[in-house]
């Protein structure tokens, strides 16, 4: 919704309400639209009158417990009877988070010999991650790290940095799983925002944000072999650059970046996403753009590391283990903490553990 006008958002909301009223659903329903920014035409792609992967993502992105509310509605309650924190009751709820959420798909074309890396209307992803940050740049870079593909930033993926601008632009003609990384290198080689827009139809805002990251990265790399000025490091961290990635750009040890950052008194803080219609339930995300709001307890704690995105050879069975480990540890009197970045899982439900951190695992 970062680039969709308030007027279009209101139209989408009003049409979704009319659709749900027409089919008579009581509970969770997700309606997916396509909007043509040129003609302003809106098309309904699909309607899922049930809990789905899309509704799970929406629930975790907004802190709105769709499954819990659906159960309350099924039991006979109405929206104006369900309490909802600062909104009073649920009928007055409107998502208004001061953070950015990004979903990034995980593909596995390398696992299938002869498979064509070409994206279209058919789903080819094997998993997905969700990242949260105060800004688009911060959330975007956290999403890349969450994929667990060995990449800690957008640059220098595969051999794209060795290709010319024209070769990179040619690779962008058809959408592939590497499109974001190719765009990044194309911008580094001098491609303009308009050139990338014409090839990809990705809105200018997102390409401009990526261009700013490229320019910032080039500035960081200009200090190769030396210590970064404090103000440059501070801005890099605010924009989501990982210590490990910065160390690669500077050709220094990662611990040198970490030590400099800590000497500056700069560390990530934890911000809550409040779960609507609950008294004090929240989950947390890290940011370098805020103040720490995570309360510390003196209870005995055990942290459970989640499985990350689903992939070939690793699926929901790993999450099953995490969930039951959390439930068993709760019974033993421990405060349980889960760290994960997969919105498809039960482990990232707000009530599976005492504290949930939506974070990259690496």
Regions found by a protein language model. Name each.
Residues 82, 248-281:
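Amphipathic alpha-helical
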Residues 1-221, 226-232, 236-240, 264-268, ...:
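ATP-dependent carboxylate activation and anion-phosphoryl transfer catalytic cores
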